[in-house]
Amino acid sequence: NAIYDKGHLLSSISNARLFDEFCKIFLGGLGEKNFNKLCSFNLNKHLVISDPDESDFSHNIMIQALRNTDDRIKNNQSVTPGFLLAALLWPKLISRCIKNNEINIRKFFRSMDGVLREQQKLTAVPRKFNSYIKDIWVLQLKLHSRIKSQPYKIIRHPRFRAAYDFLLVREKASFDKNGLGKWWTDFQKNDDSLRGSLIARINEKSDTDSSKKFGFYNELR
């Protein structure tokens, strides 16, 4: 089969050209189908450094992110390669900072640039998307913690909506039922008394170990 025999030639194509191909393949409304086809020929490694076969979660979040992107396109909603890359690279990022089924926050921050540099070798991601991707990643920490009045600041962040959408993708890919996504869905409602009660409940639990842990259970296995 020519695809199997010649697939290695993709590594000789410029990373700028491959970024263009990344956008055409994954941002045209058939991203999930195209990704599955690439995986069947073992060609996905030429476009994304994350390996969908590394874990069930890796596979789930990559598929869920692509499905989410396809759905947005069908609904005439905006899409950006920055959001998709934030999701596709997430398994690679967290795999570098997990210890004893917990994410080491210091390693989390130290690993971000390294992951992006590795992806850059495959696809020349425009610099403007690097800060976008890192904002989405860092906001995941804050979306989990919800310390005191922090949620009020988070919803004013220019990347909040993208970070919230990514949280829902992670939650779905993890099959998590603890309601973090719903908490943020409810918090966005313009109701001060509801927001106050939501925060009060979190602050009551702030001294428990579970409230200080970051990440969904299946994400950390």
Residue ranges: model-predicted function:
Residues 19-22, 26, 35, 41, ...:
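Phenylalanine-focused residue identity feature
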Residues 5-19, 107-125, 186-197:
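Short, mixed-charge aromatic SLiMs
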Residues 1-99:
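Glycine- and charge-enriched loop/helix tracts that form the active or gating conduit
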Residues 50-53, 100-102, 177-184:
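Composition- and surface-driven signal marking solvent-exposed, interaction-prone regions
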Residues 46, 121-221:
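Charged substrate- and nucleic-acid-binding regions of tRNA-handling and nucleotidyl-transfer enzymes
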Residues 61-62, 112, 212-213:
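Detector for methionine-enriched segments
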Residues 54-59, 77-154:
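Extended, charged alpha-helical interaction scaffolds
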